[in-house]
Structure formats: C-alpha cells, structure tokens
Amino acid sequence: MEPRAAVLKLIEHKHLTALEAESFMNHVMKGEVSEILLSSFLTAMRFNGESVEEVLGCTLALRKNALRPKTVFPFDLLDTCGTGGDGQGTINISTLSAIVLASLGIKVAKHGNRSVSSHTGSSDILTRLGYQTETTQEEVEAHLVNRGFTFLFAPMWHPSMKHAGPVRKELGFRTVFNMIGPLSNPFSPQFQIIGVYQPELMELFIKVLQSLGLKRALVCHSRDGLDEFSIFQITDYTFLENGVISRHSFDPKILGLSSLNKEEVYASSSDHAEVLARKVLNSESIAGTHAVALNAGAGLFVMGKIDTIEQGYQIAKEAILSGKTKKYFEDLISKE
C-alpha cells in the first residue's frame, strides 16, 4: 500500500492492517514520506484510536530499521522501559528499579531517552548519577556482558527516527510514536515490564507484546495515574506468560506500609529528581525505597525468580537497605 492510500484509509475511519502500518512506517524510516503526509497519518490514527494491528505494524518497522547488536547474548534479558508521559512528576522509578534488578543479578538492557515531559528522563538521571548513556554500540554491548546492565540511548539505536522528529515536535501531542518506543528495544528482550500513561493502553500493549512473542511481560497503570506500580494506590496490570494473557490488580496495603511521605517520590525539578534518586540509592528515602523496591519486585516476578510481586518487593527492598544496590552502582560507574 502506498503511503497516500494508507492515509486515505485512516481518514475514512478504517484501521490499517499490521502489514499496511508496517509498510507506511518503513517509508517514513527511509525518509520517503513528506511531513504533510506523515502529519496527516499520525493525526488521523490518533483520532481513530490506535489499534493493536497498527501499533504492531509500526513497532515491527521501527525494530527492522534499528541498529542491531553484534553480540549474541547467552542469557535472558529484561527491559523496564515505560511510555512516560503520565504527567505526575515522580522520580525515575523504572530506571532506579532497573539498577536494583541488575544488582540482584538480572541482566537489564534499559532502553530509554532524554526527558520528554518529566523533569528528567532515564538518560538524564543516569547521566546525573555518573553513568554515561551516550556511548558506542560496542561499549553498550560490552557493558551488558561484563556488568549485567546497559543503557540503549534511543536516538543512537534508532537513527531512522530523525525523519519523524520535526513532525512530532510540531504536532506536540501524543502519537503512535509514543507507544512504539518502549516496544522497540533493539536487543529484543524476551522479558519486559512496561508502565503506560493511560489504563486503556494496558490491553493494547500486552496484545502487541503477545504478537511479538515475548516469554513473560507485564503492563501496568496505577489508579492514582502513575505509569508504574504505586505504593499509594491499587495498580492494575495485564500479564503475559507463554502466550497467555491474564489481568490482575495489586493493592500496596498487602505490604503493610503506612505514613509514607509523597514528597519523597515527587520531584519539582531536575536537580530535585537527582537528590531524591541519590537518597534512594543511599537508603535515605523511606517512600522512595518502597516505591523502587515494589517496581523492582515486579521485575523479579516477570523474570520468574519469585512467585509473587510481594516476595520480589521484599528481596529488592533488602538489596537497597543493605547497601547492595548502592555498591553495585558505585562499581558500575567507577568503570566508566
């Protein structure tokens, strides 16, 4: 299908097949679609509501046009990349939980970018903490093999996205590109936890992950609006295991937490986000420790290392409080 035909189909309020969406996005990645046509495509798809097939097709195109690792990794990989954009201003919980997971022996290939709507994106906070995120492809792969943690800076691994950049910036609203980023880790991890900015996206994302063939994956959104597990409210999540999707809720009351200070997990600026992140790593933030441990616990659950998220939370919390995570991260950045 030619790009113009795909746009006309969307304008008629019809959804594209995965193949049609992939074809259009392949043209975009090669710089063969005009800014006007791409703008029309993104706007029409947004008005119709992105379908599973459309998101899947666009994801496949982004994956195919990404740089590929030269290394064959002989171990299971986890990514904790979320959509962001929940507008809540929390600390970088998914990034900090990735560090906790790596300190517990989980191989983490963290896919991320600079800030879009928050004070600090995953790349921003890691850089502030002393971890260099914009390195060579060879270094990124070596870090994973030798250290158990690496960061894939999205603009480096998805150079073809430069063709969509100006239109995305000019439009200024969420499009399918905000969805396919977390689904397009170039290392193709078979295990993934994704927080989404809207509850209705949980079903869409888990079905796309199912189609992509992941072994185990979890997509979550909390009832207080977070794109991660909340320590203050119930978190709903969809779960994929061996091709089967199930739906669940997690109530943090089961953890027995009380009198938590929300100010310990909400940042007012980039500098403040760094201060709060360091407090978590130094075991100086009660609420921050619980929030990061809970999300790391969910990661352990996705990896199949424990039977329940609660068990994972306890293990992750101990890693933070004992100083294990701090030592791991200090060793990590000392080798930079």
Curated annotation (Swiss-Prot):
Residue ranges that the Swiss-Prot or TrEMBL entry lists as coiled coil: none
Residues binding Mg(2+) 2: 227-228
Binding site for anthranilate 1: 82, 113
Cofactor entry: Mg(2+)
Recorded GO MF terms: anthranilate phosphoribosyltransferase activity; magnesium ion binding
UniProt keyword Calcium present: no
Amino acids binding 5-phospho-alpha-D-ribose 1-diphosphate: 82, 85-86, 90, 92-95, 110-118, 122
Pathway entry: Amino-acid biosynthesis; L-tryptophan biosynthesis; L-tryptophan from chorismate: step 2/5
EC number(s) from the headed UniProt entry: 2.4.2.18
Keyword DNA-binding: no
One GO term describing the cellular component: cytosol
Membrane-spanning residues: none
Subunit record text: Homodimer.
Task of the protein: Catalyzes the transfer of the phosphoribosyl group of 5-phosphorylribose-1-pyrophosphate (PRPP) to anthranilate to yield N-(5'-phosphoribosyl)-anthranilate (PRA).
Alphabetized PANTHER family for the sequence: ANTHRANILATE PHOSPHORIBOSYLTRANSFERASE (PTHR43285:SF2)
Protein name per the record: Anthranilate phosphoribosyltransferase
Gene name for this UniProt entry: trpD
